[in-house]
Each structure stands twice: as structure tokens, then as C-alpha cells.
Amino acid sequence: MSSAICPCGSGDLLLACCGRYHAGQPAPCAEKLMRSRYSAYVLGLTDYLVQTTLPVQQSGLNREAIAQWSAQSTWLGLEVESSEVFGGKPEHAFVTFTARWHDGNGEHSHKERSSFVQNQGRWYFIDSTVPLKAGRNDACPCGSEQKFKKCCSPYVV
């Protein structure tokens, strides 16, 4: 494994690339987290995929479905189109990418603009398939201690 190339497409060794994030080191930016999540799908690291999703959404994830999709797919590649901060707030970012894979139904390509938020030095993926339940004046679900309307509301809705 020490000489394995990272599946994220960087061309670097896994241990020097996404492997360190899988081992617990915080990803330094949203793009690195997104790349490490793609690599986690390739490697079947379901726990990592759950742990790097916004904490308030983790209980809404279907671990079995994630593991099954990961295992039943042959991952063909990742292309990152862009990575950008949102609204001048360095703790909010979008990453636009295309992931390709093959499964029992053929070859697939999925382009997505994913949302990420940083809290206490860690980046988290905001899963659009798991609803965020917060009123405008409620504490933000990202854990920032700001009101939802002043933090993630304009970013995730």
C-alpha cells in the first residue's frame, strides 16, 4: 500500500495524499476533503465518508447503501473543475467535479457542485440528500454558534 497511487487523480502516493486524511489528519481545504472522499469510495472507507459529512446529518446517512455502492462500483476517475469560497467566507466552499464509475448497469458519469463548511479546523461535506432542519433564527447546524440565517442558510438553500 505504501507505493499505491492515490485514486483521487493527483498522481501522488496514497499515503502522502488522501491516505493521511483517511488516517485522521484534517483536510486543509474543501477540495482536498472532496478528493479524499472520492478516494474513500474507491477504497470502501464507509466510516470516513460518514465522519466527513456534516455531523448533524450523519445519523440520516444510509451506511449500508454507501458501502454497497462503493463495493459494487469500479471507480474510473475524478476530475475537479473548480473549487471556490462562497460569499467571501473562507469557511464555506463549493467544489465542482465529475466522478466516473462502472457498475452492473454500465458506465456512469456524475457532475456535481458540492457544498462544504469548515468548523473547528475540520472541513465537512454538506449532503444535499439529508435535510438540514433549522429555522432562520436557530443555531446553525454546522456548529459555528452563529444563527442559521447569518451562516449557512444562504449557502445551502
UniProtKB/Swiss-Prot annotation:
It comes from Pseudomonas savastanoi pv. phaseolicola (strain 1448A / Race 6) (Pseudomonas syringae pv. phaseolicola (strain 1448A / Race 6)). The lineage of its organism: Bacteria, Pseudomonadati, Pseudomonadota, Gammaproteobacteria, Pseudomonadales. Coiled coil: none annotated. Belongs to the UPF0225 family. This is UPF0225 protein PSPPH_1399. InterPro entries: NTF2-like_dom_sf, SEC_C_motif, UPF0225, YchJ-like_M. Pfam families: SEC-C, YchJ_M-like.
